[in-house]
Amino acid sequence: MHEHSVEKTQILQKYLELPQNGKVIAEYVWVDGTGNLRSKARTLNKVITSIEQLPEWNFDGSSTNQAPGYDSDIYLKPVAFYPDPFRRGDNITVLAECFNSDGTPNKFNHRHEANKLFQAHKDEEIWFGIEQEYTLFDMYDNVYAWPKGGYPAPQGPYYCGVGAGKVYARDVIEAHYRACLYAGINISGINAEVMPSQWEFQVGPCEGISMGDQLWMARYFLHRVAEEFGVKISFHPKPLKGDWNGAGCHTNVSTKDMRVPGGMKYIEQAIEKLSKRHNEHIKLYGADNEQRLTGRHETASMTSFSSGVANRGASIRIPRPVAKEGFGYFEDRRPASNIDPYLVTGIMCETVCGAIENANMSKEYERETNEQ
């Protein structure tokens, strides 16, 4: 790690301790037109206690691949806010949806459509837990701590590894964990993954739209923490060719009927419904996913649907304790690490709980790829 790439946090600290004279800083965060995050800050005159107190804002969408230059204003509508783990105090981080100048959702705003489904199926109490895998790179786009011009020893000792040479950058991971807890993200765990310098964190259980909200914010906090250490975060599903594991976003799902004794019947019904919409789901399950879903490295084939108990090579896995108890949840192992969680949770709700008249998650993919 090169010193010039690391933020001077110790110098910054004395300024962070200065009083703000009654002002609050709100960092607005949004999803841009490339599947990445952007943010900018503004000063507010009072402590924020409800989402309604936050003003709408705007930005230049032509600089984020979200609008043409001749009509570039994109509007930010706050939908959730969290304590800011970097500025602390009364300062907040705000998640915002993007809308065009005519009031329609921007084509990269998939939260709006997904939320219609969650509102319509509120009584189902659909819960999600997402396992976010990612890979660390240095400032020169080499996998973090890998030998220069070479490769580490083959996979084997790295998954949940302990000790030098088996795990790398634990300080980044621990800092991110604490930042999420401080901000109120329902982060439920972390672990080192199968490939060296690949890690995972889990968020959930979260109900409905809050799953996407919290995962996007957890990603934002990860990027911000990694900035300070001079580390890049990659969510590419297959960052390295060869005999190395890819990166996924395994998505665990349950409805209230699945979580009570006798729930296995509803789990099996959901899997049957999912089997009939495999291709529609795959379209929304992340770019470059075909590089990962090969049937090797603990993945299913991209071209066929399968399910099984404790089978990490299946599209849908039923955990063994769930099969034994007869109720609980199932795991969709198909989503890639770079998913938009609103697309994945939205189409999952649509398939499992039922379509509604004014929402169509499959069209979200077409809207993003075809709309000018």
From Swiss-Prot:
One of its GO terms (molecular function) is ATP binding. Coiled coil: none annotated. Keywords: ATP-binding, Cytoplasm, Ligase, Nucleotide-binding. GO terms for biological process: glutamine biosynthetic process. InterPro entries: Gln_synt_N, Gln_synt_N_sf, Gln_synth/guanido_kin_cat_dom, Gln_synth_cat_dom, Gln_synth_gly_rich_site, Gln_synth_N_conserv_site, Glutamine_Synthetase. It is found in: Cytoplasm. Its main location: cytoplasm. Its EC number is 6.3.1.2. Residues 110-372 form the GS catalytic domain. SMART domains: Gln-synt_C. Residues 24-103 form the GS beta-grasp domain. One of its GO terms (cellular component) is cytoplasm. It catalyses: L-glutamate + NH4(+) + ATP = L-glutamine + ADP + phosphate + H(+). Homooctamer. Belongs to the glutamine synthetase family. PANTHER family: GLUTAMINE SYNTHETASE, GLUTAMINE SYNTHETASE 2 CYTOPLASMIC. This is Glutamine synthetase. The lineage of its organism: Eukaryota, Fungi, Dikarya, Ascomycota, Saccharomycotina. The gene is GLN1.
